[in-house]
Amino acid sequence: MSFNTIIDWNSCTAEQQRQLLMRPAISASESITRTVNDILDNVKTRGDEALREYSAKFDKTTVTALKVSADEIAAASERLSDELKQAMAVAVKNIETFHTAQKLPPVDVETQPGVRCQQVTRPVASVGLYIPGGSAPLFSTVLMLATPARIAGCKKVVLCSPPPIADEILYAAQLCGVQDVFNVGGAQAIAALAFGTESVPKVDKIFGPGNAFVTEAKRQVSQRLDGAAIDMPAGPSEVLVIADSGATPDFVASDLLSQAEHGPDSQVILLTPDADMARRVAEAVERQLAELPRAETARQALNASRLIVTKDLAQCVEISNQYGPEHLIIQTRNARELVDGITSAGSVFLGDWSPESAGDYASGTNHVLPTYGYTATCSSLGLADFQKRMTVQELSKEGFSTLASTIETLAAAERLTAHKNAVTLRVNALKEQA
């Protein structure tokens, strides 16, 4: 089924509807799983030596110094245009503003007289950021990860990227307060961050996107007792657009293509109650596609994408919630009114003037989002991902005395005698003091 095929949702059977919302299959092959496991064990055992060998093998680069020097970062900064630096500064300011606003006030309540309960927040002590290399370096992801890490107060923030590291990535790291940058890519970088080597410090939590090997490495280290936590499960990028008859077809098409050009496994979906709008968007996609440098990649993504005509906007919202897109764009005349009905989406973009690109780069929201249906249970990345919550309780003698019989009754009902004794001993001590 080509992207130009317009599908009438209500003419489909329940099984056909289910198939229409299926995502491109992702699974780590046995060979990837084994290869990654071997890389993890090798890096854990041999440290820096293994990292250099993998750089020569996979990146075709001889790495002498794994850590990027301050002079190299300064030189990279000099090579960038003032225009790009200014654009990064604007983006960082907006990201800072939005993520600073996410700080939670401390909770401090008396649940009953003499029983004080608190919730306090602490930063994750050390975090590692992974930034892919390649022809289009994702320096914007540095801004999205390092900025909230700094606001959260993480004491150690380090970054790994395949050599040679792009000037934009090095400058973004410096701009956002990353302390150390390392010439390490792939699954071996995840291993280095999870276990530590002579040069790369072990971190508590790893953030950032990557290829199938990086994704599998993150999964494996997150399940090892000697590994590290990770940000969220990863999957192909996706966007769903809800458009009414008043939407601009060229705008809708550009948003669909901005997602499709990410990779051949990306998925884009248009939901509209207007069949003419669907046709006009399909035509606009073809026109714009012809001008794109990454047209072949986008075409592959469009093979798994859909143009769906619905009964009305309410049905569009219902289908969107069922799919749970990473990015949801609502280009309707009543976009704000539809938000309360949205239950599953990574990030929502309202109206004609809120392209996905705004959130990808500079509006202030984070572009690290749950995908592949994980929006049903996972949140978009935010300040909380770089923090942990801790509870505190303090009972006075009076508070303890009042609550003691309740605790004893509950502990006895669960047959946890030591729990009950911890209370009874104190009750008896208070009686002796009286």
UniProtKB/Swiss-Prot annotation:
Record's keyword terms, sorted: Amino-acid biosynthesis, Histidine biosynthesis, Metal-binding, NAD, Oxidoreductase, Zinc
Cofactor note: Binds 1 zinc ion per subunit.
Recorded GO CC terms: cytosol
Gene3D superfamilies the record matches: 1.20.5.1300, Nitrogenase molybdenum iron protein domain (3.40.50.1980)
Binding site for substrate: 237, 259, 262, 327, 360, 414, 419
SUPFAM superfamilies referenced in this protein's UniProt entry, alphabetically: ALDH-like
Active site per UniProt: 326-327
GO annotation, biological process: L-histidine biosynthetic process
Residues the record lists as binding NAD(+): 130, 188, 211
Chain sites annotated for binding Zn(2+): 259, 262, 360, 419
EC number: 1.1.1.23
Cofactors: Zn(2+)
Protein's pathway: Amino-acid biosynthesis; L-histidine biosynthesis; L-histidine from 5-phospho-alpha-D-ribose 1-diphosphate: step 9/9
CDD domains: Histidinol_dh (cd06572)
GO molecular function: histidinol dehydrogenase activity; NAD binding; zinc ion binding
Superkingdom, natural source: Bacteria
Pfam families, alphabetized: Histidinol_dh
Catalysis: reaction(s): L-histidinol + 2 NAD(+) + H2O = L-histidine + 2 NADH + 3 H(+)
Protein family (similarity comment): Belongs to the histidinol dehydrogenase family.
Function: Catalyzes the sequential NAD-dependent oxidations of L-histidinol to L-histidinaldehyde and then to L-histidine.
Assembly mode: Homodimer.
Protein name per UniProt: Histidinol dehydrogenase
UniProt organism field: Escherichia coli O6:H1 (strain CFT073 / ATCC 700928 / UPEC)
